């Protein structure tokens, strides 16, 4: 482990887990829906789980192949609130093959008064992240021999896959929506087409997952 110093406080940090395509494919095979589709959304968009759980169908434009991230589920009280910063609020590209997975899920998704993409079967609202991680994702990771697979694993995997496909740092930052003003100023704003191209390459890596989801 490495020692990380933050304003006079030292703490140990674990190296983040990065999954291979093969590991992701096996992991989602252990997950029932809707959790399997949630994980696929995370891997194919890099969205935070708080943003995924707060997704509404009205924010997804299947004609333009875009998804607007505006709100999240707050961890403290599980209520819906705006995303943390202006950098977190953005329009993201969605790949056509990934869009087909979303459309297939929409057909079998239970109807929801709140227009949720992932409405809870128990409350008619959105799901809570922690129980899903503890009851489904972490046990699935342990079957792969990985002890600490969690929601952030998929976001970190997405970032690593972006890097592996050669996506420029500025484009990565816009897709992940990090609030790093210095990096934004240094690399400039990424155009939607640049973001779409970078995202497309990651989704191509994840194609086996999408094919399994549609099987």
Label the model's feature ranges.
Residues 1-55, 63, 87-88, 97-100, ...:
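Basic, Lys/Arg- and aromatic-enriched nucleic-acid-binding interface segment
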Residues 33, 37-40, 44-51, 131, ...:
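C-terminal catalytic core of tyrosine-transesterase DNA break-rejoin enzymes
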Residues 22, 64, 73-75, 95-147:
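Active-site/catalytic core of tyrosine-dependent DNA strand-transfer enzymes
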Residues 5, 20, 28, 70, ...:
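Residue-level detector of conserved, well-ordered beta-strand and adjacent loop positions
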Residues 64, 75-100, 104, 108, ...:
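C-terminal secondary-structure termini that scaffold catalytic or DNA-interacting sites
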Residues 59-66, 147-148, 167-186, 197:
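Short, polar N-cap/turn motifs at the start of nucleic acid-interacting alpha helices
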Residues 30, 55, 104-108, 187-190:
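Residue-level signal for well-ordered alpha-helical positions
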Residues 2-8, 71-73, 176, 191:
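Short, small-residue-rich loop/turn micro-motifs
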């Amino acid at each position: 482990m490495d020692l990380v110093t933050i304003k006079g406080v030292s703490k140990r940090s674990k190296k983040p887990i990065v999954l291979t395509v093969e590991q992701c494919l096996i992991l989602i095979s252990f997950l029932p829906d809707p959790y399997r589709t949630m994980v696929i959304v995370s891997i194919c968009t890099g969205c935070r789980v708080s943003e995924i759980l707060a997704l509404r169908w009205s924010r997804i434009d299947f004609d333009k192949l875009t998804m607007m991230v505006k709100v999240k589920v707050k961890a403290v009280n599980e209520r819906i609130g705006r995303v943390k910063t202006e950098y977190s609020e953005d329009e993201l590209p969605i790949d056509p093959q990934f869009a087909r997975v979303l459309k297939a899920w929409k057909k079998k998704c239970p109807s929801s008064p709140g227009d949720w993409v992932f409405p809870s079967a128990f409350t008619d609202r959105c799901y809570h992240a922690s129980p899903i991680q503890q009851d489904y994702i972490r046990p699935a990771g342990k079957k792969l021999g990985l002890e600490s697979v969690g929601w952030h694993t998929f976001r970190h995997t997405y970032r690593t896959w972006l890097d592996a496909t050669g996506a420029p740092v500025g484009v990565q930052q816009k897709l992940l929506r990090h609030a790093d003003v210095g990096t934004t100023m240094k690399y400039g704003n990424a155009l939607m087409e640049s973001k779409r191209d970078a995202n497309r390459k990651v989704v191509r890596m994840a194609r086996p997952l999408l094919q399994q989801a549609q099987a």
